[in-house]
Amino acid sequence: MEIREFADMDKFEDIMNNWAKATGLATVAVGADGKYISGCYNFTDFCIKLTRGSKEGCRRCEKCDREGKGVYHCHAGLIDFGIDLVVEGQKVGSVIGGQVLPEHPDEEKFRKVARELGINEDKYIEALKKVNVRTEESINASAMLLGQVLNNFINAEYSKKINGSIIGSLTDGVNAANHLVEEIKKKTGELRSIQSKQKILAL
């Protein structure tokens, strides 16, 4: 089951975009296979251009994307989150994001990360200074809110599609029954006509 098969993705992405603007956090949705199914909202240069721009950094980021649950510290020292998207007990994807700091950073710690990833230290620190700072409590509340809203939305979309299919099937059934009734009436009329002719001939 894929979200794009039953959900209005324009509305889905509107929710994500508005949430990202309101909270200052980054977010993206992935399918059950881990591949992106939405745009990337509010992504920082620190993450998308520098950390993910290095081979080792990208490998570590993808590992966090796959394995991160709830609110957690990513390999580069930022706070990220991963919330499952579930329909009828089946995981159909995840919404991931964050890319914020829980406190003002220790530059030396991040210079060490830059060296490990083969990234220019000064550029890394310059990008780091543009990363938003949020308390873990507010990050957790924001992540849970997005997860709840998206889960409610996709479940409503799924129910609408399923109910629409049921109604469509019932309508088809009613139409078929009406057609059958009309055919029976027609055949009955033809039979009565034949019977009348037979009576006349019998006279």
Where do the language-model regions lie?
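Structured interaction and signal-relay segments at domain junctions
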Residues: 1-77
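Exposed alpha-helical structural elements
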Residues: 11, 59-60, 109, 123, ...
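Sensory/regulatory domains in signal-transduction proteins
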Residues: 62-115, 130-145, 149-153
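A short, charged helix-loop
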Residues: 115-126
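Signal-transducing coiled-coil/dimerization helices and immediately adjacent hinge/linker segments
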Residues: 130-203
